[in-house]
């Protein structure tokens, strides 16, 4: 789950990490009220969407007067914005964050994440903040520093001070940096987060460090014990079909292609998409119907796939281990009848009760195309889509 900047800053502040004073507003007049409550300007007005790159898209404005604040908020609120991170999708701006604006002396980068390669919680820091860290890694990798945290020892103050001096901080600032690292480690673990990225972590004209922007990503598997985070979810920032799928407990991700996929098992689903690509097709989605799939679940999966008008064909690829192929076949037949599927459907079944499942499909009298294996199925669905065009 992703979070808005104002939510990320709220969590950072709760854990003693300094952030500029600020508050969200839903109308231009509210934005002016917030600005006045923060004292004399200048202020920053920032569009709240689940994406980075807002500045380049016009979603971050420096304001010297309350008239500027009102104008900036009016221009953003009620509109939609796309950035280089949204893949062409426009996200609604329902809130703006109004904060104090100090003069930036230096921008740093700091993040904490789980490094699956080293199997540790890892910090990444750089003296080059305010830009994409991928760009820094490509152009000046020597400016990036990493720390793999020992689970027994945890992060200590000396780790942070050492990092701070590597980034060119003075003694006072290195001490602040160490405190931020220790508090960030506590936040990361206690909230079951997968990523926290502070970019930039800035030195302002008062000589102190502040988190000017924060990107959070939580571990959805821990949602049952993170009620505060779950309450922060903003479904207006998410793909509608993905929201519906999550409510049905179906793993679904929208993609840009035209061939819908229904598969049981995440690994098989990814392999299916790869084979479709290798055969010249483009997957329209990732959909793992799950090992405990039943007839109704298959029907709901078809509805999710066909909710996109981009879908011109469907490949059902099922390996029946826990799930029975005959039950999947019953679900496919029921779905085709109930949903009124008008695009080619290719089905590959293998595993438990496979012959019974295939017989049900044959006896249905429906124009369902059988496939012998994953490659055969991918070829057939790509060909069927081309022939139907």
From Swiss-Prot:
InterPro entries: ATP-grasp, ATP-grasp_succ-CoA_synth-type, ATP_grasp_subdomain_1, Succ-CoA_synthase_bsu_CS, SUCC_ACL_C, Succ_CoA_ligase-like_bsu, Succinyl-CoA_synth-like. SUPFAM superfamilies: Glutathione synthetase ATP-binding domain-like, Succinyl-CoA synthetase domains. Disulfide bonds: none annotated. Gene3D superfamilies: ATP-grasp fold, A domain (3.30.1490.20), ATP-grasp fold, B domain (3.30.470.20), Succinyl-CoA synthetase domains (3.40.50.261). Succinyl-CoA synthetase functions in the citric acid cycle (TCA), coupling the hydrolysis of succinyl-CoA to the synthesis of either ATP or GTP and thus represents the only step of substrate-level phosphorylation in the TCA. The beta subunit provides nucleotide specificity of the enzyme and binds the substrate succinate, while the binding sites for coenzyme A and phosphate are found in the alpha subunit. It holds the Pfam family Ligase_CoA. It comes from Xanthomonas euvesicatoria pv. vesicatoria (strain 85-10) (Xanthomonas campestris pv. vesicatoria). NCBIfam families: PRK00696.1, sucCoAbeta. Its cofactor is Mg(2+). Pathway: Carbohydrate metabolism; tricarboxylic acid cycle; succinate from succinyl-CoA (ligase route): step 1/1. Substrate binds at residues 264, 321-323. GO terms for biological process: succinyl-CoA metabolic process; tricarboxylic acid cycle. Mg(2+) binds at residues 199, 213. It catalyses: succinate + ATP + CoA = succinyl-CoA + ADP + phosphate; GTP + succinate + CoA = succinyl-CoA + GDP + phosphate. This is Succinate--CoA ligase [ADP-forming] subunit beta. GO terms for molecular function: ATP binding; magnesium ion binding; succinate-CoA ligase (ADP-forming) activity; succinate-CoA ligase (GDP-forming) activity.
């Amino acid at each position: 789950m992703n979070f808005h900047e104002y939510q990320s800053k709220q969590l950072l502040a709760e854990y003693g990490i300094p952030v500029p004073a600020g508050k969200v507003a839903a109308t231009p007049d509210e934005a002016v009220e917030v600005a006045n409550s923060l004292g004399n300007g200048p202020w920053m007005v920032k569009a709240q969407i689940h994406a980075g790159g807002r500045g380049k898209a016009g979603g971050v404005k420096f304001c010297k007067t309350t008239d500027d604040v009102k104008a900036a908020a009016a221009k953003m609120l009620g509109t939609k914005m796309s950035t280089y991170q949204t893949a062409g999708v426009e996200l609604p701006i329902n809130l703006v964050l109004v904060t104090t604006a100090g003069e930036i002396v230096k921008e740093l980068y700091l993040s904490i994440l789980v490094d699956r390669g080293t199997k540790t919680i890892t910090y990444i820091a750089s003296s080059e903040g305010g830009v994409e860290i991928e760009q820094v890694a490509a152009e000046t990798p020597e400016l990036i520093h990493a720390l793999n945290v020992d689970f027994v020892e945890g992060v200590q103050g000396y780790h942070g001070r050492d990092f701070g001096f590597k980034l060119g901080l003075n003694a006072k600032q290195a001490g602040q940096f160490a405190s931020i690292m220790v508090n960030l480690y506590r936040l990361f673990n206690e909230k079951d987060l997968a990523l926290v990225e502070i970019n930039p972590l800035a030195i302002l004209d008062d000589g102190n460090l502040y988190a000017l922007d924060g990107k959070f990503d939580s571990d959805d598997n821990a949602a049952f014990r993170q009620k505060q985070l779950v309450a922060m979810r903003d479904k207006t920032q998410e793909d509608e079909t993905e929201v519906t799928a999550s409510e049905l407990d179906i793993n679904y991700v929208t993609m840009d292609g035209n061939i819908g996929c229904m598969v049981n098992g995440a690994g098989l689903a990814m392999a299916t998409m790869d084979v479709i690509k290798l055969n010249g097709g483009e997957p329209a989605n990732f959909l793992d119907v799950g090992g405990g799939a039943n007839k109704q679940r298959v029907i709901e999966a078809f509805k999710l796939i066909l909710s996109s008008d981009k879908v011109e064909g469907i490949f059902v690829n099922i390996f029946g281990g826990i799930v029975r192929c005959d039950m999947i076949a019953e679900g496919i037949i029921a779905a085709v009848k109930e949903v009124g599927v008008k695009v080619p459907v290719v089905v590959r079944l293998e595993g438990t009760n496979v012959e019974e499942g295939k017989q049900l499909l044959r006896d249905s009298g429906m124009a369902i195309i059988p496939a012998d294996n994953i490659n055969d199925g991918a070829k057939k669905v790509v060909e069927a889509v081309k022939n139907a065009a």
